[in-house]
Structure formats: structure tokens, C-alpha cells
Amino acid sequence: MSKNTARQLTLAASFFRGCASKIQNMADSLYFSLWFSDFGPAEMLVRALSVMRQFPFSKGLPGITYYALHPVSWNEPTIFEQRFHPGATPEEAIAVAADLLHEDYAYVFEAKWDLWTPQTSEGAWTLAPSTVTFIVRGEEFEEGESKTQGEVQLDFGLDTPFLHEELKLTQGVESRVRANVQMLVDFINRVEKSSIAGTRLLWSESGENLAQKLVGRLQRVQ
């Protein structure tokens, strides 16, 4: 092997290691899905309400802020949408949705909770509202999508607030990340105690385990 070829291979290996590191640190979508033993039209919004009641709403933007009704499939246009100013209580939002109950409908609600968010590169953080989406699927919606995605599913958005892998892990960063994770864990624990869900799953779009990613993140500086 010539020196030039060896140098090219070394550069290529370095390039792919860099790519792998970037891919590994990419933010991932985070979800919490629940399945129930009974989830017909008469029960599904009641089950969703039991989850919403445990949610730690943002102090500055409390309540349900948005509701949309999707018929049959995500490809179909919504047949009803409403924004709430100020935010509605879970009971009020569910009451709006309860007028149209069908097994092939999906009911989407949005709310916000407060998570620690970096404001500057100098280490300033603030509690800022972050959107969480509640998705309630009828059993026949999107050809039975609820079987794999959840009858009630929470979309937390990207897992960035619970890892912040883009930041150097100082004591300050670690304390804020841990506070956000504790908010998530406390909410899930309350749901597990109060709901009658038969199956519950916290999962990510990539299939990676959030707890393992967090442990790995913390261990890199120990």
C-alpha cells in the first residue's frame, strides 16, 4: 500500500468517525404511549382525561391550548380545530371533543410545560414553555395505528431538553438536565398510578433508550 493510499484511508476513517459521532448525538423524537383494556368511543376521551389531569402545565401558559379532530387518516383534512385563549382545562377541552366520537377518528390536543432551556453560551438558563402533543386514536383510525403507536400517545418533541448533548456537560448543565428528566419521570409515575392503562411505553423514534443515553452522557465526564 502506498503512503498516499494509506493517508487517504486514514482521512476517510477520521471522516466517518466524525459522521458517526454527529449521528449519535442527533436529537431524537420522544414519545409515551398507553394502551387500555377497553378503549371504545365511550371510553377513549375518559382515558385521555385521566392522563391530562396528571400533566404539569406551564405556569405561564396553562391548560390545553389547541385541539384538532382528524377523520379516518392523517392524510385527510381536519374537520374541526380550535385554539384556546387562555388555555382550557382538560375537562373543558375534552367536552369540546366529546361531541364527535368515532372509532376512526383521532383527537389531537396541545399543551405546554416548563423545561429548563439554555439562553446564552455564558450558562444562563430559564424555564421556558415547551409543547407536548396528546394524540387519542380510535381503534380504526389509520387502519388500526393505535395498536403500534398507542391509544393515547404523548409526543414530547425532541429529547434535547433531557440530554443537551450539544453542550459541554458542566455541573450547571447536568443539574438542569436532571431537573428536566425528573419532571418527565414524575409525570410518568403519576400517570402510572392514576390511569388504568394495561401497557405503557416510553420510546424514541430511533429505538434508543433514553435512560441508557442519559447514563452514557453522564459517564463520559466521570
Please give the residue ranges for each predicted region.
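Cationic, low-complexity basic patches in intrinsically disordered or flexible, solvent-exposed regions
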Residues: 8-9
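Short, intrinsically disordered low-complexity segments
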Residues: 55-136
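Acidic, proline/glycine-rich low-complexity IDRs
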Residues: 147-222
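Short glycine-rich, low-complexity/disordered patches
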Residues: 3, 22, 57-78, 110-113, ...
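Short, hydrophobic beta-strand segments
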Residues: 30-36, 82, 98-101, 152-164, ...
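Short, extreme N-terminal segment that most often corresponds to the first beta-strand
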Residues: 15-76
